[in-house]
């Protein structure tokens, strides 16, 4: 799903000397992201699995939902291994193929555990993370190839846009099917193990693509003659360790000076991404209180995926046609949009007779209503998901492009993986913090705080329900962290300007 201009831009990178077949390279870049998108097939079934099969409450379910992403955190380790440790004669190709096969294996294990009826949360936490860790390794290898070729040809932005276009297509279809499967699971027509088994199929595509399309020079590994260790060897090793410990602080300071943009990028990514998250808790509330069904979640999330796809294409077109708009301008606009639209976050917690509904509520004639069984809350979630999801795509794409432009090519795999892993760590951290805050606010000792909030003008819903009050408080917490990103955008902008680093959002040096 690329425009002819994007195709021409990618083709222009080919040269006889380099012998890079960009048609094959697109498969290498796109297949892992397509497969990552198909992983969304499990998103809704796992939500219901945590809530009803494992029987977890709000804070516990939120914590489990966050911790199942730990497998993505070791991306820097995978990046280092990919950069420095060849296997079967290759740095990238062999790891790419091996981990794709292991992803299949771990999803089969998840299917078997579900089939035998195991309900031990800790076991699933381990097996989910083993599966996600393999996706992370393939992702690292793919991104290392993308950064290496993209930086050389000035096409990082174009490659990033291409990858996430592919992911959006797969995600939209998979999450819809996930909702459909969960409905059938609740009707006892299908079973969760089937969803896990089907999720293990697409990684085979990645393995096949790696075997057929990754062109990599084979690494010749020198065979060193074995010799017996001696006391001199031991003493020399001890000296090296002490020397490393003595010089480590100076080496770290030198590394920090030479990679100053990356440190600013780390701060920016953390504060741009971080806001205490209650995703599972909110969805659980929507199931219990607002009557959301698996089909509704599937349609809403799928519509969000389609919106993501369309917005990626529009974003790619805009940044090519209007290159004069700087990356920081887009991000400041995203902050402003978040501030302006934050009152919309309250609507899911407002009763139908609340006066705020008068401003936006209207009835659709039955003959025009494609989803007659839906209530106002499901429709509201769908409309907001589509409209705001479309408008906020730069907030997602721009940090990826900046990371690709600033990482040191000497360790492209590890460096880019570290920045992306920081993004994943931030996602987990915000989920863990969200679970902790929700648990804290739920304690009897915090009743005074809740009573004060309930009696104040900040209680927009006018509710006395504890869960709703806490969810309202998180709306204000989210607004605070949105505003907190402003100084870090400016810090990063000044550092990139000082270093003379240009960020080409459209993937073209001439832009």
Whereabouts are the PLM-identified features?
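Intracellular juxtamembrane helix-capping segments at the cytosolic ends
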Residues: 137-151, 393-408, 414
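Helix-to-loop junctions at the C-terminal end of transmembrane segments
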Residues: 73-90, 182, 310-329, 438-439
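Helix-loop boundary and gating motifs at the non-cytosolic
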Residues: 10-72, 261-290, 431
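A membrane-interface helix-boundary motif in multi-pass transporters
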Residues: 90-94, 180-201, 326-327, 438-482
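C-terminal transmembrane helical hairpin of 12-TM major facilitator-type secondary transporters
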Residues: 328-398
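Transmembrane alpha-helices of Major Facilitator/SLC transporters
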Residues: 71-78, 297-321, 334-342, 427-430
């Amino acid at each position: 799903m690329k425009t002819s201009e994007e195709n021409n831009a990618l083709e222009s990178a080919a040269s006889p000397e380099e012998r890079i077949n960009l048609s094959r390279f697109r498969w290498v870049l796109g297949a892992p992201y397509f497969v990552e998108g198909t992983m969304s097939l499990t998103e809704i079934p796992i939500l219901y699995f945590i809530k009803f099969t494992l029987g977890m409450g709000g804070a516990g379910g939120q914590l489990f939902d966050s911790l199942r992403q730990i497998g993505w955190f070791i991306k820097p380790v995978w990046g280092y291994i990919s950069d420095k440790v060849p296997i079967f004669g290759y740095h990238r190709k062999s790891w790419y193929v091996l981990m794709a096969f292991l992803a299949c294996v771990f999803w089969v294990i998840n299917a078997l555990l579900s089939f035998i009826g195991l309900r031990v949360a800790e076991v699933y936490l381990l097996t989910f993370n083993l599966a996600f860790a393999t996706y992370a390794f393939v992702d690292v290898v793919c991104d290392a190839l993308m950064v290496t070729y993209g930086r050389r040809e000035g096409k990082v932005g174009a490659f990033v846009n291409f990858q996430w276009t592919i992911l959006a297509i797969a995600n939209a279809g998979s999450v819809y099917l996930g909702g459909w499967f969960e409905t059938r699971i609740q009707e006892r027509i299908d079973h969760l193990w089937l969803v896990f088994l089907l999720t293990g199929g697409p990684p085979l595509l990645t393995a096949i693509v790696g075997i057929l399309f990754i062109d990599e020079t084979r690494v010749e590994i020198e065979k060193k003659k074995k010799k017996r260790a001696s006391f001199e060897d031991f003493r020399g090793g001890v000296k090296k360790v002490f020397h490393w410990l003595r010089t480590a602080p100076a080496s770290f300071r030198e590394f920090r000076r030479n990679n100053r943009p990356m440190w600013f990028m780390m701060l920016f990514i953390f504060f741009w991404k971080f806001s205490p998250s209650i995703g599972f808790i909110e969805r659980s509330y929507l199931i219990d209180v607002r009557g959301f069904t698996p089909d509704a979640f599937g349609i809403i999330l799928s519509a969000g995926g389609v919106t993501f796809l369309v917005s990626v294409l529009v974003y790619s077109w805009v940044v090519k046609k209007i290159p004069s708009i700087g990356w920081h301008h887009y991000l400041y606009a995203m902050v402003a949009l978040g501030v302006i639209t934050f009152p919309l976050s309250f609507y899911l917690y407002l009763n139908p007779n609340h006066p705020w509904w008068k401003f936006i509520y209207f009835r659709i004639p039955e003959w025009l209503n494609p989803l007659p069984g839906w209530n106002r809350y499901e429709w509201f979630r769908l409309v907001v998901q589509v409209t705001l999801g479309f408008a906020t795509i730069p907030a997602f794409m721009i940090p990826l492009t900046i990371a690709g432009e600033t990482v040191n090519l000497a360790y492209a795999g590890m460096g880019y993986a570290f920045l992306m892993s920081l993004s994943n760590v931030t996602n987990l951290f915000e989920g863990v913090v969200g679970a902790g805050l929700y648990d804290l606010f739920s304690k009897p000792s915090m009743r005074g705080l809740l009573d004060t909030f309930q009696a104040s003008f900040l209680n927009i819903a006018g509710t006395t329900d504890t869960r709703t009050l806490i969810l309202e408080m998180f709306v204000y917490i989210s607004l605070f962290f949105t505003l907190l990103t402003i100084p870090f955008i400016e810090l990063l902008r000044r550092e990139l300007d000082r270093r003379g680093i240009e960020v080409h959002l459209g993937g073209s040096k001439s832009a």
